[in-house]
Design a protein with these regions (language model features):
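C-terminal catalytic/acceptor-binding lobe
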Residues: 1-18, 29-36, 43, 211-333
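Hydrophobic targeting segments
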Residues: 19-25, 47-54
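Short glycine/serine/threonine-enriched helix-capping/active-site loop
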Residues: 26, 130-135, 262, 269
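Active-site-proximal specificity loops/subdomain of glycosyltransferases
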Residues: 58-99
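Short beta-strand-to-loop acidic/aromatic patch adjacent to the donor-nucleotide binding site
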Residues: 99-112
Length: 333
């Protein structure tokens, strides 16, 4: 089990605080990837001095990996599905009212701008939702910063065409280019890693939680921009497109296209090759999740059946594992 390291590092206390801002995240690692755990440790070192709430979701017979404290809690569920948005909604619903600005972050990212959260709150005075970064960079194994300069890359609005490890954020493109209207994921901007919104937006319309093999951020981005329907989403979520479009319309109704971003970069810490993420192929499994409607006592979707072998394989292959793979998907007795 990962225990919190109290020793200061170069990442500790680097980000500046805002009293009304709350960071929320979830962690699940049923494949027992040592690299995902390593990424979490680096991430946590960078945000542990800020207001934060994290849920570790222990799936099936997986072994808990995080030490619980007042900010890190643990819940259990049976089925291997993408529970991210359900977990985030659960956190938001239980937050004290004093937190007016919510930032939901993946637990494998590092920000270069120490004022990202303060500037994020500033952006949310005139916008309803933001991405708190302009560029995202996929790091190589064991890196904590890129091995290349961003100077020339930033001169292009299509950084991914210059270096396939770099994207501009969807929100940055929304603010100052027309690229957000493009149908190509590589051109319209990256939709993942980190978002922030006014608390009342998420209270009014909770995050879409039926993207059970992932992709919820993609739905959020196009919905916030009022792109309903959008070919990206119609193609990837055709099996559940009616509920996606209904949620998207509701979400746009409160966001109303008021989207912003924060200057700076975000580093994605390596825990598996990007080529193995199968961001497109994974949506082949969405039809398998269409009829999943049951939820457990924590509000997470369950099937009351053995996990689908194809979905299990997808989650296994997207992670970097050391040694012989073990089965972490037995149903708890």
């Amino acid at each position: 089990m990962f225990k919190l390291n109290r020793k200061k590092t170069e990442l500790t206390d680097n980000y500046h605080r805002h009293s009304e801002a709350m960071i929320i995240s979830c962690f699940f690692n049923p494949q027992n990837s040592v690299y995902r755990l390593k990424a979490f440790k680096l991430f946590y070192e960078s945000i542990k001095h800020l207001n934060h709430t994290i849920i570790e979701c222990v799936i099936g017979n997986s072994i808990p990996q995080l030490e619980e404290n007042e900010n890190i809690k643990r819940i259990y569920t049976e089925n291997l599905l993408w529970h991210k948005e359900s977990l985030l909604n659960k956190i938001i619903s239980n937050l004290p009212a004093k937190y007016k600005y919510i930032f939901w972050l993946d637990t494998d990212v590092i920000f270069t701008n120490p004022d990202w959260i303060v500037e994020g709150v500033r952006q949310l005075q005139s916008n309803n939702i933001i991405q708190p970064f302009e560029y995202c960079i996929f790091l190589e194994k064991d890196e904590i910063k890129p091995s290349f300069s961003m100077d020339d890359i930033k001169k292009s609005f299509l950084p991914n065409a210059i270096n396939n490890k770099v994207w501009r954020s969807f929100s940055a493109n929304f603010v100052d280019t027309e690229l957000w209207k493009n149908r190509s994921y590589h051109k319209h901007g990256h939709v993942g890693f980190a978002w922030g919104a006014k608390r009342d937006i998420l209270d009014s319309v909770p995050l879409f939680d039926k993207a059970l093999v992932g992709g919820g951020d993609h739905i959020i981005a196009h919905a916030a921009a009022g792109q309903i329907p959008h070919s990206c989403i119609s193609n990837d979520f055709s099996a559940i497109i009616d509920i996606v479009n209904q949620w998207s319309s509701d979400f746009y109704g409160v966001v109303n296209g008021k989207i912003g971003f924060v200057n700076g970069e975000i580093y994605h810490l390596w825990h598996g090759d990007i080529e193995k993420r199968q961001y497109v192929k994974r949506h082949e499994y969405t039809p398998m999740t269409k009829d999943i409607v049951l939820r457990d006592e924590n509000g997470l979707f369950i099937t009351n059946e053995i996990d689908d072998v194809n979905i299990k394989r997808y989650f296994e292959e997207k992670e970097a594992l050391e040694g012989k793979r073990k089965c972490f998907f037995r149903v708890r007795k």
